[in-house]
Design a protein with these regions (language model features):
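Coupling and communication elements adjacent to P-loop NTPase active sites across diverse families
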Residues: 1-11, 101-124, 221-331
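Conserved beta-strand
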Residues: 4-7, 14-27, 63, 321-325, ...
Length: 407
């Protein structure tokens, strides 16, 4: 069992508490999904569980973690950089792991994952594989260790649909404990039997954590019903509060007017006492307003608008390549293809991992780079290829770098 006690995570820069006072147990058979918005601390929590004694960048943590599982393994969001230069053979038959891996089971997993077992002795570098192929080998090697506990950071990324379905069924049926991060609702629904939700409240000024022993679909439906009930009750409270405050203002204005008109000292004393009572009611209403339910705010969906002041003509050829073969390091990945793409067409590249989708996308990028009259945007699978690692997000988004732009 893995036990966490009073875990709190605080951002070093603005001292915002990302995760407040979290305690939970992870037991064999648990499939605990860690969900929440980007940047709420999910990956940092997973990293801390992996190495509680190691400091984390950008955050301060307090709390304790005791892990009684015999073997805990971790798969991160990105393939380890130190393994990119290994050959497939060196990665799969690492002598450090040789005595720990059941290679009969490993070959079985590789086949189930749709990776050709004949390629396991290849001298091809891991860094030249597609993201999905790397993850398949990583999953096979990890599962062949037969761990008692799995820590997985978005394991459904990069996988083709068939492999994603296989992974969902495999994880759901594992006797091991699994704690995983995911934004994929279908994957969450198939795997999770517990939910740990880190959410921001009060317009992102605070955080709270909910731990429930429910599958994802049940949690989502109950949460939505709770949102509706709380919203109805909060609006009813606000309406009643507004009525009480309106009556209070009327009473306050009436007594204040009477005080100004009073010339008799006895009447003045009575009205002054009445005004004190009115002000007491006002203070009570203020305290009541502080204790009212908030109208719940759902996490905002991401809305991306791509401005295009001068759309491409629908008839304009972007790509027109007959008999094109996708190749990688001299190896043909496809049969000859006829590639045709005109302006305003939206084309999706689909297919199993390793068939050449990313390679083809890079080739299309190369064809269109510096094309006159065309503004090209490119988003690779690994953003480290295009994002400067030595800049902050603010520095990257600035155009001029001036102080005026920063403020």
């Amino acid at each position: 069992m893995l036990h966490v006690e009073n875990f709190t995570m605080t951002h070093q820069q603005d001292l915002k508490v990302l995760i407040p006072s979290l305690s939970f147990d992870l037991k064999p058979g648990d499939k605990l999904a860690l969900i929440g918005e980007e940047g709420c601390g999910k990956s940092s929590l997973l990293n801390w569980l992996r190495q509680p004694d190691q400091p984390l960048p950008y955050v301060e943590v307090t709390g304790t973690c005791s892990n009684a599982f015999g073997r805990t393994v971790w798969i991160g969001q990105t393939f380890p950089a130190q393994d990119e230069g290994l050959t497939i053979e060196a990665y799969c038959f690492d002598p450090v792991l040789a005595e720990q891996i059941d290679y009969g089971y490993f070959y079985q997993l590789v086949s189930q994952l749709g990776f050709d077992p004949d390629r396991l002795t290849s001298q091809q570098l891991m860094g030249t594989l597609s993201g999905g192929e790397k993850l398949k080998l990583q999953l096979a090697r990890t599962l062949a260790l037969e761990p008692d506990c799995l820590l997985l950071d978005e394991p459904s990324n990069d996988l083709d649909l068939a492999t994603l379905d296989w992974l969902s069924r495999t994880l759901a049926n594992l006797p091991a404990a699994v704690l995983f991060i995911s934004h994929d609702e279908a994957f969450l629904s198939q795997v999770a039997n517990r939910i740990l939700h880190i959410e921001t409240i009060h317009n992102h000024k605070a955080s709270r954590v909910q731990l429930v022993n429910l599958d994802y679909e049940t949690y989502r439906s109950q949460r939505q019903a709770q949102f509706q009930r709380q919203g109805q009750l909060a609006r009813k409270q606000q309406e009643e509060q507004a009525k009480q405050e309106a009556r209070h203002r009327q009473m306050h204005d009436k007594v204040q007017h009477q005080l100004r008109q009073a010339h008799d000292s006895s009447l003045g004393r009575l009205l002054a006492k009445k005004m004190r009572n009115v002000k007491s009611v006002g203070r009570r209403l203020e305290r009541q307003a502080e204790d009212m339910l908030e109208i719940p705010i759902q996490e905002d969906a991401i809305l991306v608008k791509l401005p295009c002041p001068h759309p491409l003509p629908a008839s304009k050829w972007l790509v027109n390549e007959p008999d094109y073969v996708v190749r990688l390091e001299g190896r043909s990945l496809t049969q000859p293809l006829t590639l045709e793409w005109r302006g305003q067409e939206k084309i999706g590249l689909v297919g199993p991992n390793g068939v050449g989708k990313s390679t083809l996308l890079k080739q299309v990028r190369d064809w269109l780079t510096d094309r006159p009259g065309l503004r090209l945007g490119y988003m690779p699978q690994d953003y480290r290829q295009v994002l400067p690692q030595d800049q902050t997000p603010l520095d990257f988004l600035q155009e001029s770098g001036s102080q005026e732009e920063k403020t």
